[in-house]
Regions:
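Gly/Pro-enriched, hydrophobic low-complexity segments
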Residues: 25, 30-58, 75, 83, ...
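Flexible, processing/modification-adjacent segments and terminal tails
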Residues: 109-188, 193, 246-248, 256-341, ...
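Bacterial N-terminal signal peptides that target proteins for export
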Residues: 1-9
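Solvent-exposed N-terminal domain segments of exported/luminal and surface proteins
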Residues: 30, 34-250, 256
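Sec/Tat signal peptide C-region and signal peptidase I cleavage site
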Residues: 20-24
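Short acidic/polar alpha-helix capping motifs at helix-coil junctions
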Residues: 214-216, 325, 355
């Protein structure tokens, strides 16, 4: 049994489950969705002192032409206070170990805390599918924590009974049915110098469609991803194709332009390094966590209030990348932190399994189920890699989205900034739903043709 205090409600919530249990939520629990809980399972009420407000539906869906600058509805907000090395101890109960480490060890690192704006909502179709899943969705009982049963187009476990279910909500976070994005991955050195790997990426998420009545309806596919490097010249034409599944391990292929050869990647998951990423990111770190859950025991610790990146309009606004990343962290004036409730999940490597990160801690936003912070530890229990993601509402989608994230490797004193879109063409978040992505792109036989264009 897990017991934790439901913050803001003033009542104790108990979740009962046995080891390996796969049961969905009860009808009584599911009935809370849309009432005291939001339609995706967050606490609707604010907290006791009002620093976290009541959820009122998030920003409404709106019209936006591709290429139009995003309008920041909270641009007039001013920081309430800042957290830095001089006062970090005062706020440590609302910070992760990784955040505290960055504040204490990176000179000038600070977190500007703004008023909390619960801006994230979803289309009605997502709410409806989430409600169905509340009493339907189940994980496998074979110890692998695969998704055994659910409908698509919604969150599977709005009322999670264990840590694995909470992480599956992150894996299936709703960001539309497919997108085309252009970005740069920046590899940053201790002296602040960096080089960028420019990439074009096509993503389809078949299980994000409300038409998917089961994993079998989409041939077990969660996501298909095609990534093409476009700069620097030494990397141009490299292609990675990956298929992420709901019930089995990932498949991946890579095209090498110099050899005009397609090679199947034997292991594109777990702690295997992403090719060309200078050993700074593992396959299951992208984005924040992805892939199979079977090497860890997952503990749902409970909820806590935490300062996390939120409503990151200023950070993702168009500007030269060199103006965003200064020294060993993104420019502080561009970052916005807010107080939100997060689910804390601890992952510990199972006995008999191996992974370079023997322990991981994830902090999952209650309103979006997105992992916003993650700490990774080595075999000696020492903090190794610290990760942070940002999010903002995409009004054309009617949902919050997350692209940019950073990962600091504390052992080599470097960090990487993933999915930096500030200097790139705009992301087409509606490309999948509106038919602007050719499904043939995601076939391994097409890789050489795409690379030879």
């Amino acid at each position: 049994m897990i017991q934790f205090r439901a913050l803001g409600l003033g009542v104790v919530v108990s979740t009962f489950f046995a080891a390996g249990a796969v049961n969905a939520a009860t009808e009584a629990d599911a009935a809370k969705l849309g009432k005291e809980l939001t339609p995706v399972g967050a606490e609707k009420a604010g907290n006791k002192d009002g620093s976290i407000p009541e959820w009122k539906g998030g920003l409404p869906k709106g019209q936006r032409k591709l290429g139009d600058a995003r309008v920041d509805p909270f641009a007039a907000d001013k920081p309430l206070f800042s957290i830095d090395a001089s006062n970090v101890e005062k706020y440590k109960d609302k910070l992760s170990a990784g955040q505290i480490e960055l504040i204490k060890t990176r000179k000038g690192y600070r977190m500007d805390v703004y008023p909390t704006q619960r801006s994230c909502g979803y289309p009605d179709s997502v709410y409806g599918q989430t409600k169905i899943n509340a009493t339907l969705a189940k994980l496998s009982n074979d110890g692998k924590d695969n998704l055994a049963q659910a409908v698509g187009g919604g969150f599977p476990f709005a009322i999670p009974g264990n840590g694995a279910e909470a992480v599956w909500n992150h894996r299936l976070r709703w960001q539309g049915e497919g997108r085309v994005e252009f970005y740069q991955t920046n590899f940053i050195n201790p002296d602040g110098s960096f080089y960028g790997l420019a990439q074009d990426q096509w993503i389809m998420t078949p299980f994000a469609s409300p038409k998917a009545k089961s994993p079998e309806d989409v041939a077990d596919v969660q996501m298909k991803l095609l990534n093409v490097a476009t700069a620097p010249a030494s990397r141009t034409g490299e292609i990675i194709l990956a298929h992420y599944f709901l019930k089995k391990s990932n498949d991946a292929w890579m095209y090498f332009p110099g050899q005009r050869r397609v090679r199947r990647l034997p292991a594109f998951e777990y702690d295997n390094p992403i090719p060309g990423y200078e050993n700074l990111e593992t396959a299951d770190q992208y984005p924040m966590f992805a892939g199979s859950l079977d090497r860890y025991d997952w503990k749902l610790v409970g909820k806590q209030e935490m300062y996390v990146p939120y409503n990151s309009f200023k950070f993702v606004a168009k500007r030269p990348v060199k103006e965003v990343y200064e020294g060993m962290y993104p420019k502080r004036d561009l970052m916005r932190y807010e107080l939100h409730r997060v689910w804390k999940v601890e992952a510990t490597v199972k006995q008999g399994m191996r992974h370079m990160f023997t322990k991981r801690t994830f902090y999952i936003d209650e309103d979006t189920w997105m992992i916003l912070n993650a700490d990774q530890y080595d075999a000696q229990g020492k903090l190794w890699r610290v990760m942070e993601a940002s999010l903002y509402p995409a009004v054309e989608l009617g949902a919050c989205v997350s692209q940019e994230f950073q990962s600091w490797d504390l052992t080599v004193n470097r960090y990487m900034a993933e999915n930096s879109t500030q200097e790139a063409k705009p992301t087409d978040w509606l490309a999948g739903a509106e038919g602007r992505i050719d499904p043939k792109r995601f076939e391994s036989d097409e890789l050489r043709r795409v690379g030879d264009r």
